[in-house]
């Protein structure tokens, strides 16, 4: 059976950011997860084990830890996002092959992420592919849901 996929049939491309445009084994999300636990620990005065349990509870109940923190604890979302995305991105290397592949795709390209706009910009710059995207749709543009 012949593959009928033709990239020229598409006008828009939407890319997820984290663990999609760079390898999961770069351990970026594990850093974010640890920062979420530390944030909860600091703000709620919990040890790390109980902070992680609270993170999981909020995630399961609200779909994101942030939504739970906003709802139950009135946490200001930008303070949370700035804290949890203050991470080391040095494991992400410039990806020239990805840049070329993105340039070859016809149509507008967008990033969609449940991370912050600033985090998305930082990752895209680290990868060397930011200029390929028309815009970034982040957790802020989605009203933190």
Predicted feature residues:
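N-terminal helical cap/lid subdomain that shapes the substrate entry/recognition surface
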Residues: 5-15, 20-97, 118
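Conserved phosphate-coupling serine/threonine residues in phosphotransfer and NTP-handling enzymes
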Residues: 113-115
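Substrate-recognition "cap/lid" segment bordering the active-site pocket of phosphatases
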Residues: 117-145
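Short active-site oxyanion
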Residues: 107-111
């Amino acid at each position: 059976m012949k593959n009928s996929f033709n990239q020229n049939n598409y006008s828009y491309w939407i890319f997820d950011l984290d663990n999609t445009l760079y390898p999961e084994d770069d351990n970026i999300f594990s850093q974010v997860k640890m920062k979420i636990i530390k944030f909860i620990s600091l703000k709620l005065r919990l040890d790390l084990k109980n902070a992680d349990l609270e993170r999981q509870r909020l995630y399961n109940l609200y779909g994101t830890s942030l939504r739970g923190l906003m709802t139950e604890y009135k946490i200001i979302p930008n303070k949370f996002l700035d804290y949890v995305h203050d991470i080391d991105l040095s494991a992400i290397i410039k990806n020239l092959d990805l840049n070329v592949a993105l340039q070859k795709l016809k149509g507008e390209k967008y990033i969609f992420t449940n991370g912050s706009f600033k985090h998305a910009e930082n990752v895209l710059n680290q990868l060397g592919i930011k200029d390929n995207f028309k815009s970034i749709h982040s957790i802020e543009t989605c009203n933190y849901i």
